[in-house]
Amino acid sequence: MSKENIFVTKPTLPPLNDLIPYLEKIWETRVLTNGGEFHQKFEAALCDYFGVHHICLFTNATIALVTALQALRITGEVITTPYSFVATSHALLWNGIKPVFVDIDPHSLNLDPARIESAITPHTTAIMPVHCYGHPCDVNGIQRIADNYNLKIIYDAAHAFGVQDAGGSILRYGDLSVLSFHATKVFNTFEGGAIICPDEKTKVRIDQLKNFGHVGETTVVAPGINGKMSEFNAALGLLQLQHIDSALACRQKIDEAYRLKLAGIPGISCIQGSGECVANYAYFPILVHEDYFLTRDTLYNLMKEKGIHPRRYFYPLISQFPMYRGLSSAHPDNLPVALDISQKILCLPIYPDLEMSVVDVICQLIANPC
Protein backbone atom coordinates (compact mmCIF):
# COMPACT_ATOMS: atom_id res chain seq x y z
CA MET A 1 0.00 0.00 0.00
CA SER A 2 1.29 3.45 -0.92
CA LYS A 3 1.85 6.18 1.63
CA GLU A 4 -0.75 8.48 0.09
CA ASN A 5 -4.03 9.11 1.89
CA ILE A 6 -6.95 6.94 0.83
CA PHE A 7 -10.16 8.97 0.83
CA VAL A 8 -13.72 7.71 0.75
CA THR A 9 -13.92 8.58 -2.93
CA LYS A 10 -11.86 9.96 -5.78
CA PRO A 11 -13.45 11.76 -8.74
CA THR A 12 -13.59 9.74 -11.93
CA LEU A 13 -12.21 11.68 -14.91
CA PRO A 14 -11.81 10.87 -18.60
CA PRO A 15 -8.43 11.06 -20.37
CA LEU A 16 -7.49 14.74 -20.55
CA ASN A 17 -6.63 14.58 -24.24
CA ASP A 18 -10.15 13.38 -25.00
CA LEU A 19 -11.56 16.59 -23.55
CA ILE A 20 -9.48 18.91 -25.75
CA PRO A 21 -11.71 18.69 -28.88
CA TYR A 22 -14.73 19.64 -26.77
CA LEU A 23 -12.90 22.67 -25.39
CA GLU A 24 -11.78 23.69 -28.86
CA LYS A 25 -15.41 23.62 -30.00
CA ILE A 26 -16.44 25.85 -27.09
CA TRP A 27 -13.62 28.29 -27.87
CA GLU A 28 -14.62 28.28 -31.53
CA THR A 29 -18.31 28.99 -30.96
CA ARG A 30 -17.88 31.23 -27.90
CA VAL A 31 -21.13 29.73 -26.58
CA LEU A 32 -20.45 29.19 -22.88
CA THR A 33 -23.93 28.68 -21.40
CA ASN A 34 -27.66 29.30 -22.02
CA GLY A 35 -28.50 25.95 -23.58
CA GLY A 36 -25.81 25.62 -26.22
CA GLU A 37 -24.99 22.65 -28.43
CA PHE A 38 -23.31 20.53 -25.75
CA HIS A 39 -26.13 21.24 -23.30
CA GLN A 40 -28.71 20.02 -25.79
CA LYS A 41 -26.69 16.95 -26.74
CA PHE A 42 -26.07 16.06 -23.10
CA GLU A 43 -29.77 16.26 -22.26
CA ALA A 44 -30.59 14.01 -25.20
CA ALA A 45 -27.82 11.54 -24.30
CA LEU A 46 -29.00 11.29 -20.70
CA CYS A 47 -32.60 10.72 -21.79
CA ASP A 48 -31.37 7.87 -23.96
CA TYR A 49 -29.16 6.43 -21.20
CA PHE A 50 -31.92 6.47 -18.58
CA GLY A 51 -34.78 5.61 -20.91
CA VAL A 52 -36.73 8.76 -20.01
CA HIS A 53 -38.26 11.45 -22.21
CA HIS A 54 -37.53 14.75 -20.48
CA ILE A 55 -34.62 16.03 -18.41
CA CYS A 56 -33.46 19.48 -17.30
CA LEU A 57 -29.78 20.08 -16.58
CA PHE A 58 -28.70 22.19 -13.62
CA THR A 59 -25.61 23.83 -12.20
CA ASN A 60 -25.92 21.57 -9.13
CA ALA A 61 -28.40 19.28 -7.43
CA THR A 62 -29.22 21.64 -4.57
CA ILE A 63 -30.46 24.32 -6.96
CA ALA A 64 -32.30 21.55 -8.80
CA LEU A 65 -34.08 20.50 -5.58
CA VAL A 66 -35.00 24.10 -4.79
CA THR A 67 -36.37 24.54 -8.30
CA ALA A 68 -38.23 21.21 -8.32
CA LEU A 69 -40.20 22.29 -5.26
CA GLN A 70 -40.95 25.64 -6.86
CA ALA A 71 -41.96 24.02 -10.14
CA LEU A 72 -44.60 21.87 -8.42
CA ARG A 73 -45.74 24.81 -6.27
CA ILE A 74 -45.08 22.92 -3.05
CA THR A 75 -45.97 24.79 0.15
CA GLY A 76 -46.74 24.07 3.80
CA GLU A 77 -45.17 20.85 5.07
CA VAL A 78 -43.16 18.15 3.31
CA ILE A 79 -42.45 14.73 4.80
CA THR A 80 -38.80 13.78 4.44
CA THR A 81 -35.96 11.76 5.92
CA PRO A 82 -33.53 12.93 8.61
CA TYR A 83 -30.94 10.51 7.20
CA SER A 84 -29.43 12.32 4.23
CA PHE A 85 -27.04 15.09 3.27
CA VAL A 86 -28.31 18.36 4.67
CA ALA A 87 -29.10 19.81 1.21
CA THR A 88 -32.25 17.68 1.09
CA SER A 89 -33.89 19.65 3.89
CA HIS A 90 -32.14 22.93 3.10
CA ALA A 91 -34.01 22.97 -0.21
CA LEU A 92 -37.25 22.96 1.76
CA LEU A 93 -36.20 25.88 3.96
CA TRP A 94 -35.15 27.88 0.89
CA ASN A 95 -38.76 27.56 -0.28
CA GLY A 96 -40.26 28.47 3.08
CA ILE A 97 -41.45 24.88 3.58
CA LYS A 98 -41.50 23.08 6.93
CA PRO A 99 -39.69 19.71 6.92
CA VAL A 100 -41.48 16.94 8.78
CA PHE A 101 -39.04 14.16 9.63
CA VAL A 102 -40.11 10.53 9.53
CA ASP A 103 -37.99 7.59 10.64
CA ILE A 104 -36.20 5.24 8.27
CA ASP A 105 -36.47 1.54 7.54
CA PRO A 106 -33.70 -0.34 9.44
CA HIS A 107 -32.74 -2.41 6.40
CA SER A 108 -32.92 -0.08 3.37
CA LEU A 109 -32.18 3.05 5.47
CA ASN A 110 -34.76 4.83 3.31
CA LEU A 111 -37.91 6.62 4.43
CA ASP A 112 -40.20 4.06 6.10
CA PRO A 113 -43.63 4.09 4.41
CA ALA A 114 -45.20 2.56 7.52
CA ARG A 115 -44.42 5.78 9.40
CA ILE A 116 -45.45 8.31 6.77
CA GLU A 117 -49.22 8.29 7.16
CA SER A 118 -49.23 9.27 10.82
CA ALA A 119 -47.09 12.32 9.98
CA ILE A 120 -49.54 13.71 7.42
CA THR A 121 -51.45 16.85 8.46
CA PRO A 122 -53.80 19.22 6.60
CA HIS A 123 -50.66 21.23 5.72
CA THR A 124 -48.80 18.34 4.06
CA THR A 125 -48.36 18.83 0.32
CA ALA A 126 -45.55 16.46 -0.66
CA ILE A 127 -43.15 13.68 0.28
CA MET A 128 -39.42 14.00 -0.42
CA PRO A 129 -37.69 10.63 -0.01
CA VAL A 130 -34.03 9.85 -0.73
CA HIS A 131 -32.72 6.74 -2.49
CA CYS A 132 -30.03 6.41 0.18
CA TYR A 133 -26.68 5.09 -1.09
CA GLY A 134 -28.42 4.44 -4.41
CA HIS A 135 -30.71 1.76 -2.94
CA PRO A 136 -34.30 2.30 -4.12
CA CYS A 137 -37.01 3.43 -1.75
CA ASP A 138 -40.23 1.46 -1.40
CA VAL A 139 -41.56 3.42 -4.36
CA ASN A 140 -44.86 1.56 -4.57
CA GLY A 141 -45.62 1.96 -0.89
CA ILE A 142 -44.81 5.66 -1.00
CA GLN A 143 -46.86 6.15 -4.17
CA ARG A 144 -49.94 4.51 -2.61
CA ILE A 145 -49.80 6.93 0.30
CA ALA A 146 -49.29 9.91 -2.00
CA ASP A 147 -52.25 8.86 -4.14
CA ASN A 148 -54.50 8.41 -1.10
CA TYR A 149 -53.72 11.89 0.21
CA ASN A 150 -53.19 13.72 -3.09
CA LEU A 151 -49.54 14.47 -2.33
CA LYS A 152 -46.68 15.14 -4.73
CA ILE A 153 -43.47 13.09 -4.60
CA ILE A 154 -40.04 14.54 -5.33
CA TYR A 155 -37.26 11.96 -5.11
CA ASP A 156 -33.82 13.11 -4.06
CA ALA A 157 -31.99 10.69 -6.36
CA ALA A 158 -28.57 12.25 -5.85
CA HIS A 159 -27.05 8.80 -5.19
CA ALA A 160 -29.01 6.90 -7.81
CA PHE A 161 -27.36 7.46 -11.21
CA GLY A 162 -27.82 4.33 -13.31
CA VAL A 163 -29.82 2.36 -10.74
CA GLN A 164 -32.60 0.18 -12.16
CA ASP A 165 -35.35 -2.06 -10.88
CA ALA A 166 -37.12 -4.72 -12.93
CA GLY A 167 -38.96 -2.08 -14.95
CA GLY A 168 -36.02 0.19 -15.76
CA SER A 169 -34.56 3.35 -14.25
CA ILE A 170 -35.79 4.21 -10.77
CA LEU A 171 -35.77 7.83 -11.93
CA ARG A 172 -39.17 7.25 -13.53
CA TYR A 173 -40.93 7.22 -10.15
CA GLY A 174 -42.61 10.15 -8.43
CA ASP A 175 -43.54 13.50 -9.91
CA LEU A 176 -39.89 14.56 -10.22
CA SER A 177 -36.50 12.98 -9.52
CA VAL A 178 -33.36 15.02 -8.87
CA LEU A 179 -29.85 13.80 -9.72
CA SER A 180 -26.45 15.05 -8.58
CA PHE A 181 -23.37 15.20 -10.80
CA HIS A 182 -21.13 16.48 -8.01
CA ALA A 183 -17.46 15.51 -8.00
CA THR A 184 -18.11 12.91 -5.28
CA LYS A 185 -20.81 11.05 -7.21
CA VAL A 186 -20.41 7.98 -9.43
CA PHE A 187 -21.01 10.24 -12.44
CA ASN A 188 -19.69 13.78 -12.25
CA THR A 189 -19.52 16.92 -14.36
CA PHE A 190 -17.31 18.62 -11.72
CA GLU A 191 -20.52 20.27 -10.44
CA GLY A 192 -23.95 19.62 -11.85
CA GLY A 193 -27.38 18.14 -11.44
CA ALA A 194 -30.59 17.36 -13.27
CA ILE A 195 -34.33 16.97 -12.87
CA ILE A 196 -36.15 14.13 -14.59
CA CYS A 197 -39.54 15.42 -15.74
CA PRO A 198 -42.74 13.51 -16.58
CA ASP A 199 -43.85 15.65 -19.51
CA GLU A 200 -42.96 18.52 -21.83
CA LYS A 201 -45.10 21.05 -19.95
CA THR A 202 -43.22 20.45 -16.70
CA LYS A 203 -39.87 20.62 -18.49
CA VAL A 204 -40.76 23.99 -20.00
CA ARG A 205 -41.70 25.39 -16.59
CA ILE A 206 -38.49 24.10 -14.99
CA ASP A 207 -36.38 25.46 -17.85
CA GLN A 208 -38.00 28.85 -17.30
CA LEU A 209 -37.44 28.77 -13.54
CA LYS A 210 -33.74 27.89 -13.88
CA ASN A 211 -33.33 30.88 -16.23
CA PHE A 212 -34.56 33.59 -13.84
CA GLY A 213 -38.19 32.92 -14.83
CA HIS A 214 -37.61 34.32 -18.32
CA VAL A 215 -39.91 33.53 -21.23
CA GLY A 216 -38.31 35.20 -24.22
CA GLU A 217 -36.38 38.46 -23.96
CA THR A 218 -38.91 40.71 -22.26
CA THR A 219 -41.22 38.51 -20.21
CA VAL A 220 -40.60 37.09 -16.74
CA VAL A 221 -43.28 34.75 -15.39
CA ALA A 222 -41.83 33.72 -12.00
CA PRO A 223 -39.06 34.61 -9.54
CA GLY A 224 -36.65 32.06 -10.95
CA ILE A 225 -32.96 31.54 -10.33
CA ASN A 226 -29.80 31.04 -12.38
CA GLY A 227 -29.53 27.28 -12.33
CA LYS A 228 -28.23 26.65 -15.84
CA MET A 229 -25.45 24.16 -16.56
CA SER A 230 -22.52 25.61 -18.52
CA GLU A 231 -21.32 24.27 -21.86
CA PHE A 232 -18.09 23.09 -20.23
CA ASN A 233 -19.92 20.95 -17.68
CA ALA A 234 -22.25 19.58 -20.35
CA ALA A 235 -19.33 18.74 -22.63
CA LEU A 236 -17.58 16.94 -19.79
CA GLY A 237 -20.79 15.05 -19.09
CA LEU A 238 -21.01 13.86 -22.69
CA LEU A 239 -17.48 12.53 -22.45
CA GLN A 240 -18.06 10.97 -19.04
CA LEU A 241 -21.00 8.99 -20.41
CA GLN A 242 -18.56 7.08 -22.62
CA HIS A 243 -16.80 5.74 -19.52
CA ILE A 244 -19.56 5.35 -16.92
CA ASP A 245 -20.39 1.69 -17.54
CA SER A 246 -16.78 0.56 -17.13
CA ALA A 247 -16.49 2.70 -13.99
CA LEU A 248 -19.57 1.06 -12.48
CA ALA A 249 -18.18 -2.39 -13.33
CA CYS A 250 -15.00 -1.55 -11.41
CA ARG A 251 -17.07 -0.40 -8.45
CA GLN A 252 -18.97 -3.67 -8.48
CA LYS A 253 -15.74 -5.68 -8.17
CA ILE A 254 -14.65 -3.59 -5.19
CA ASP A 255 -18.06 -3.99 -3.57
CA GLU A 256 -17.85 -7.77 -4.01
CA ALA A 257 -14.33 -7.84 -2.56
CA TYR A 258 -15.38 -5.91 0.54
CA ARG A 259 -18.34 -8.22 1.14
CA LEU A 260 -16.18 -11.31 0.83
CA LYS A 261 -13.38 -10.06 3.07
CA LEU A 262 -15.60 -8.51 5.76
CA ALA A 263 -17.89 -11.52 6.08
CA GLY A 264 -17.71 -13.13 9.49
CA ILE A 265 -16.04 -10.25 11.35
CA PRO A 266 -17.91 -10.02 14.68
CA GLY A 267 -19.83 -6.77 15.05
CA ILE A 268 -19.54 -5.70 11.40
CA SER A 269 -22.42 -5.92 8.92
CA CYS A 270 -22.64 -4.69 5.34
CA ILE A 271 -25.69 -2.79 4.10
CA GLN A 272 -27.58 -4.82 1.51
CA GLY A 273 -29.47 -3.59 -1.54
CA SER A 274 -33.20 -2.96 -1.51
CA GLY A 275 -34.48 -4.57 -4.68
CA GLU A 276 -32.42 -2.97 -7.43
CA CYS A 277 -31.70 -5.15 -10.47
CA VAL A 278 -28.85 -2.88 -11.55
CA ALA A 279 -26.87 -1.18 -8.77
CA ASN A 280 -24.31 1.61 -9.06
CA TYR A 281 -22.16 0.77 -6.01
CA ALA A 282 -21.97 4.46 -5.13
CA TYR A 283 -21.05 3.83 -1.49
CA PHE A 284 -19.88 0.96 0.66
CA PRO A 285 -21.57 1.46 4.04
CA ILE A 286 -21.03 -0.85 7.00
CA LEU A 287 -22.55 -0.88 10.47
CA VAL A 288 -20.26 -1.10 13.49
CA HIS A 289 -22.30 -2.84 16.19
CA GLU A 290 -21.84 -2.97 19.95
CA ASP A 291 -20.17 -6.39 19.81
CA TYR A 292 -17.31 -5.14 17.62
CA PHE A 293 -13.87 -4.69 19.20
CA LEU A 294 -14.12 -0.87 19.12
CA THR A 295 -16.75 1.82 18.95
CA ARG A 296 -17.55 3.22 15.53
CA ASP A 297 -15.78 6.49 16.26
CA THR A 298 -12.70 4.77 17.65
CA LEU A 299 -12.44 2.69 14.47
CA TYR A 300 -13.03 5.82 12.39
CA ASN A 301 -10.19 7.67 14.11
CA LEU A 302 -7.87 4.66 13.95
CA MET A 303 -8.38 4.38 10.21
CA LYS A 304 -7.64 8.08 9.74
CA GLU A 305 -4.42 7.67 11.72
CA LYS A 306 -3.45 4.99 9.18
CA GLY A 307 -4.16 7.32 6.25
CA ILE A 308 -7.54 5.79 5.42
CA HIS A 309 -10.43 8.26 5.46
CA PRO A 310 -13.90 6.71 5.69
CA ARG A 311 -16.92 8.95 6.25
CA ARG A 312 -19.83 8.73 8.67
CA TYR A 313 -22.60 9.28 6.11
CA PHE A 314 -24.99 10.40 7.64
CA TYR A 315 -23.91 11.55 11.08
CA PRO A 316 -25.19 13.67 12.66
CA LEU A 317 -28.77 13.49 11.44
CA ILE A 318 -30.18 16.51 9.63
CA SER A 319 -32.67 16.78 12.48
CA GLN A 320 -29.80 17.41 14.91
CA PHE A 321 -28.55 20.58 13.22
CA PRO A 322 -29.52 23.90 14.85
CA MET A 323 -31.97 25.02 12.16
CA TYR A 324 -33.97 21.78 12.49
CA ARG A 325 -33.66 20.49 16.04
CA GLY A 326 -36.48 22.72 17.30
CA LEU A 327 -39.04 20.97 15.08
CA SER A 328 -41.29 18.55 16.94
CA SER A 329 -40.58 15.86 14.33
CA ALA A 330 -36.84 16.24 15.02
CA HIS A 331 -37.11 14.86 18.55
CA PRO A 332 -34.90 11.77 18.97
CA ASP A 333 -37.87 9.74 20.26
CA ASN A 334 -39.51 10.20 16.85
CA LEU A 335 -36.45 8.91 14.97
CA PRO A 336 -35.02 5.94 16.91
CA VAL A 337 -33.89 3.92 13.89
CA ALA A 338 -32.22 6.84 12.13
CA LEU A 339 -30.47 7.87 15.34
CA ASP A 340 -29.22 4.32 15.95
CA ILE A 341 -27.96 3.89 12.39
CA SER A 342 -26.23 7.29 12.40
CA GLN A 343 -24.18 6.18 15.41
CA LYS A 344 -23.08 2.91 13.75
CA ILE A 345 -22.60 3.83 10.09
CA LEU A 346 -19.22 3.99 8.38
CA CYS A 347 -18.74 4.36 4.62
CA LEU A 348 -15.53 2.77 3.36
CA PRO A 349 -13.47 4.02 0.39
CA ILE A 350 -14.81 2.98 -3.00
CA TYR A 351 -13.94 4.33 -6.45
CA PRO A 352 -13.00 2.70 -9.78
CA ASP A 353 -9.22 2.81 -9.46
CA LEU A 354 -9.05 1.81 -5.80
CA GLU A 355 -6.45 -0.95 -5.74
CA MET A 356 -7.47 -4.35 -4.40
CA SER A 357 -4.35 -4.32 -2.25
CA VAL A 358 -5.77 -1.27 -0.48
CA VAL A 359 -9.11 -3.03 -0.02
CA ASP A 360 -7.14 -5.88 1.59
CA VAL A 361 -5.39 -3.49 3.98
CA ILE A 362 -8.68 -1.81 4.94
CA CYS A 363 -10.38 -5.15 5.63
CA GLN A 364 -7.38 -6.47 7.57
CA LEU A 365 -7.42 -3.35 9.74
CA ILE A 366 -11.13 -3.79 10.46
CA ALA A 367 -10.63 -7.49 11.22
CA ASN A 368 -7.62 -6.87 13.48
CA PRO A 369 -7.75 -3.29 14.81
CA CYS A 370 -5.89 -3.93 18.06
What are these model-derived regions, one by one?
Residues Y155-T189, V204, G216-V221:
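Conserved active-site segment immediately N-terminal to the catalytic lysine
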